[in-house]
Amino acid sequence: MKINQYVVELWHEPGMSPLSNAASRKMANHTHEVLPGLMEARGMKMIGAYHLDPEHRSILIFEAKCVEDVRDVLYEIGFMHWCDDRIFPTTPLPEMHKWAAAQEPI
């Protein structure tokens, strides 16, 4: 089965930051504890995780069979309690260029 890559952007308001909000900190700690097991159960792998300083934003990069696996993990680990998110399917730039070059221009 083909493994795809997905970029996830997560963000929250400053008042929801685990830095200052005790409930969010508890959720963040729980998230980091359970994430490896949830990913393993779906055959997923995290290949990147970055905080965008000084914003309240993070970028996660996953390898997964389908976008639904990524979505479900985000819900099950609790990110949706304190973060908003966007999930982006990705295409390697050389593949995108080849595809785009084959399209008829306007």
Language model features with spans:
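Short S/T/G/P-rich N-terminal loop/turn motif that feeds into the first structured element of a domain
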Residues: M1-H56, K65-D69, P94-I106
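Glycine-centered loop/turn motif at secondary-structure junctions
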Residues: G43, G78-H81
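Short hydrophobic/aromatic beta-strand micro-patches
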Residues: I61-E63
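Short amphipathic alpha-helices in soluble, non-transmembrane regions
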Residues: V70-G78
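Conserved short beta-strand edge segments in small beta-sheet-based binding/regulatory domains
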Residues: M80-P92
